[in-house]
From Swiss-Prot:
Source organism of the structure: Mus musculus (Mouse)
Tissue expression: Expression is restricted to lymphoid tissues. Expressed at highest levels in spleen and at lower levels in the thymus and bone marrow. First detected in more committed lymphoid progenitors and strongly up-regulated as these differentiate into pre-T and pre-B cell precursors.
Alphabetical keyword list: B-cell activation, Cytoplasm, DNA-binding, Isopeptide bond, Metal-binding, Nucleus, Phosphoprotein, Repeat, Transcription, Transcription regulation, Ubl conjugation, Zinc, Zinc-finger
Region ranges (Disordered): 1-85, 370-396
Gene responsible for this protein: Ikzf3
Name under which the protein is recorded: Zinc finger protein Aiolos
Amino acid sequence: MEDIQPTVELKSTEEQPLPTESPDALNDYSLPKPHEIENVDSREAPANEDEDAGEDSMKVKDEYSDRDENIMKPEPMGDAEESEMPYSYAREYSDYESIKLERHVPYDNSRPTGGKMNCDVCGLSCISFNVLMVHKRSHTGERPFQCNQCGASFTQKGNLLRHIKLHTGEKPFKCHLCNYACQRRDALTGHLRTHSVEKPYKCEFCGRSYKQRSSLEEHKERCRAFLQNPDLGDAASVEARHIKAEMGSERALVLDRLASNVAKRKSSMPQKFIGEKRHCFDANYNPGYMYEKENEMMQTRMMDQAINNAISYLGAEALRPLVQTPPAPTSEMVPVISSVYPIALTRADMPNGAPQEMEKKRILLPEKILPSERGLSPNNSAQDSTDTDSNHEDRQHLYQQSHVVLPQARNGMPLLKEVPRSFELLKPPPICLRDSIKVINKEGEVMDVFRCDHCHVLFLDYVMFTIHMGCHGFRDPFECNMCGYRSHDRYEFSSHIARGEHRAMLK
């Protein structure tokens, strides 16, 4: 056994340099030291002599050699591959640099250095890719979100969800101060301003404030139209603004000056009628009546209330001296009243010469003629309507129950001495028409009826009635109030309004 131990040591030292034959292993493993090589050479002779000493030495040799080969041979190859991976990044990026997804190509090309993306059609800058895609649908016409009930299509899902509420009738946003309910949050926000005293929207032309932005925009359109009027100079506009600030009645002044420029009014700006009261004038209204500037100021809250207060305050005695001045134009007071309160025109019917026919049924004509009243206002007698005869039959039935008897001159104007001071001006139009026309709904209730005496059209809605009356001209009922087109009769006027050919005739 003593001889076997050196043999085992010799064989183990001989087997160690075997893996060094591989060139890869030379790079990773160091060579044996010089003194170890000398020891091996000195022991080769006794080892060769004792090769046949025993089989145990061969078993030990095979066991150690197999284990060393399994450990040392795979490791240099694996280490060589793994050592090359950290230095192959440039090659990997060069391979992936040419690969781009199709959906990201427009994203990369349209994204500028500032962080926003530009539309390749119109150049609009968008803050995100989703906003850009929604914007591009306006160019392509794509509407992917469609309503399954009516077929309406939308570019965004939020618009579709808002549209669906129209079918369901859902109104989730409710006012905590009243019974108002709406489908959109911004509509509720605008409604809440009506309950507050704050008026955040102010006009830079005249200084008037409004609660709603839409009211301010409508007012600014009227102010711009007045400032751009070529008939008035800059000095007149500045003076008008000073008067406006001093008297606090810019609304009446703007309407007064707009009346002289009716033909230049835009078709997209219908007249706005203020007030909830429904009045009808039983007495004739003569457009020749003129008011002085001191008596012309009205309250800014309710225009209809201001008109009633002015007439009741002045009375017939104050109006008499003004009747004897027919040459004065009617561009000041009459258009203001007719533009804000059109029912006065419908009940009086002064432009088409109908007051003479109407008053014959309820006023006895005297034999004597006053010389001072021979002159008639040109606006009251010069323009005759083509359907005056038809109005005669209708009004005979409407006013045959009236028993008021007043003396009247030949020109159709009643004598102001006989006119009572308290005018009966507060009769609503439905009461005036119920004696002749009755409209009954399905519940059997009598509905309110509003009649246009110029067109012979009945309206069940007061708002539609006021809009229709705003289409009639101030001086001539068959003159379009939006473009100035003059019709020969009510049929041509109705056709003109139905076609809506106003923009081509604007000056």
